[in-house]
Regions:
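C-terminal lobe and pocket-closing loops
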Residues: 216-286, 315-318
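Hinge/capping helix and adjacent helix->loop/strand transition within the periplasmic-binding protein
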Residues: 94-100, 114-193, 197, 248, ...
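N-terminal (or domain-start) structured segment
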Residues: 23-124, 185-198, 203-208, 301-303
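Ligand-binding pocket segment of bilobal, Venus flytrap-like solute-binding proteins
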Residues: 164-168, 172-244
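Extracellular/periplasmic bilobal clamshell ligand-binding domains
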Residues: 305-326
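Short, low-complexity disordered leader/linker segments with a strong preference
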Residues: 1-42, 326
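Short coil/turn segments
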Residues: 51-52, 107-108, 141-146, 165-170, ...
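Mature extracytoplasmic/periplasmic domains
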Residues: 236, 286, 291-311
């Protein structure tokens, strides 16, 4: 599958959460035999969300592909959930200069600062690589009366529809907000800290609909426990398991949005360490482990490394500011 660059537009509401960061500690790096940077000991991949969701899957898969690209590295994953990602990102902010630390990043990197209630933005960190784009599906229980996304939208104009979201600044909330703006419907949000919790709530009948990435819900789709009403993507998926799911646009809802998946290093690291991690991730996306991650999670392999990733973030941040800057 060919990898390309892409840019997406996001929107998010205000998050009333402010977390102060502490000062960073030991860099964790060392000088190699050739005078360049090398990590010292194990590397930690921070996931700013709970276990079981798309961000957790991304962080663990990224660790695996890094290890495949460099057999001298061992990557452990550490979940720091809370505040729709704010807890993990704020912890990461406090680790400025730590060259043995990475973070599995996504849309919250841009969405949280737009809220104006956190003490960081993307410029406080070191962008390493954008790995992929991840579209989302509107999901209902198998016994739901709704057959299409258009059915849900029409119902939401006159009755209460509870919509489960994973974090109040993430992809799920964005697509529901864009759908509201496009159609005039209103959804009653119920936030959860991870895709795993969101799936459990949907299966338990606590919510009417959910927005979930294919990789988070494919097992339940294949078992028939849930149904996908539409995909918030520009075109239908090429993947056989998802090819029959119509886009929202096909149902008269002109909304598409892709959450990016990527890797950050802390701010304040050396240029040698930055280049080391860029080189490592460029090697990582050439591994079979990367291809497996893309295919198993039904992602679009659109990559951007180093300065290209910075440009991607700059462009999307400008678009976000235009939408919700006032």
């Amino acid at each position: 599958m060919k990898r390309t660059r892409s840019a997406v537009l996001a929107w998010t509401p205000v998050l009333a959460l402010s977390l102060a960061a502490c000062s960073g500690g030991d860099s964790g790096g060392s000088t190699g035999a050739d005078g360049g940077f090398e990590p010292r000991g194990d590397v930690t991949m921070v996931v700013p969300f709970g276990a079981g969701g798309g961000s957790d899957l991304a962080g663990r898969a990224t660790g695996t592909m890094i290890e495949a690209a460099n057999e001298d590295l061992t990557v452990s994953v550490e979940n720091r959930e809370g505040g729709s990602g704010a807890v993990g990102y704020s912890y990461f902010l406090g680790e400025s200069g730590n060259e043995n630390l990475l973070l599995a990043t996504e849309t919250a990197l841009l969405a949280l600062p737009i809220s104006g209630e956190v003490e960081f933005d993307y410029t406080d960190f070191t962008p390493i690589m954008k790995l992929a784009d991840d579209f989302t599906l509107m999901i209902v229980n198998a016994d739901s009366p709704y057959q299409t996304c258009a059915d849900v939208v029409e119902a939401a104009k006159s009755e209460r529809i509870t919509a489960g979201i994973s974090g109040i600044t993430g992809l799920d909330n964005i697509v529901f907000t864009l759908t509201e703006q496009e159609t005039g419907a209103e959804f009653d949000r119920v936030p959860f800290e991870s895709g795993g919790e969101l799936t459990a709530a949907l299966l338990g009948g606590q919510i009417d609909i959910a927005s979930l990435n294919p990789g988070e819900i494919i097992g339940q789709l294949e078992s028939g426990d849930v149904r996908a009403l539409c995909a918030f993507s520009e075109e239908r998926y090429d993947y056989e398991a998802l090819a029959d799911i119509p886009t929202a646009a096909e149902q008269g809802i002109d909304v598409s949005f892709a959450q990016f998946r990527g890797v950050l290093a802390p701010g304040g690291i050396s240029e040698e360490a930055r280049q080391y991690w860029i080189d490592t991730m460029e090697a990582a996306v050439e591994t079979e482990e990367y291809q497996t991650y893309i295919e198993d999670n039904y992602l679009q392999p659109n990559t951007a490394s180093g300065d290209e990733f910075v440009e991607y973030l700059e462009g999307n941040n400008e678009l976000l500011q235009q939408v919700i800057g006032e």
